[in-house]
């Protein structure tokens, strides 16, 4: 049967346009932003282990969930936090850390995704991210593994850890107490984020 005769003059184009809109809508990804952030930076020193906490980071992502509600695609992801948002229990330690991180010249730490590989598990999605991490003004390609779980309220919890060597970012490990206490070169970044639909 002739589709044009069935639909009438002009209607095939309207139908085609409607189908295109449906296809675009089906493939459209959603934008998510962080509603809760908990970042811990931990390391060692010649005296004791230390930890700095950050609750002011921002994260944004463009993603898609499958029919089961699990993360299916991750197209974009960006993360940024002010260096001065990192806080420990000792202001003297904070100031030395900011100096080591060159906060005057490079006030932000950031990560921008270039690609992502997603593996589905029984409890969520494991995401292997490739992207550019910038610390103290030095940018490096870094892989980052995150576990993503969709919550009953449709938010997404993102957790993971990443070990970083300060020397790779041209950072001289800070010292304290007039140099008597020296920090180790390696630090561990632990993150727990909650993303909500924007």
For each of these PLM feature ranges, what is it?
Residues 2-15:
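Bacterial N-terminal signal peptides that target proteins for export
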Residues 6-8, 23, 67, 177:
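Intrinsically disordered, low-complexity segments enriched in small/polar residues
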Residues 12-24:
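Bacterial N-terminal signal peptides
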Residues 28-198:
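Low-complexity, acidic/polar, glycine-enriched regions of mature
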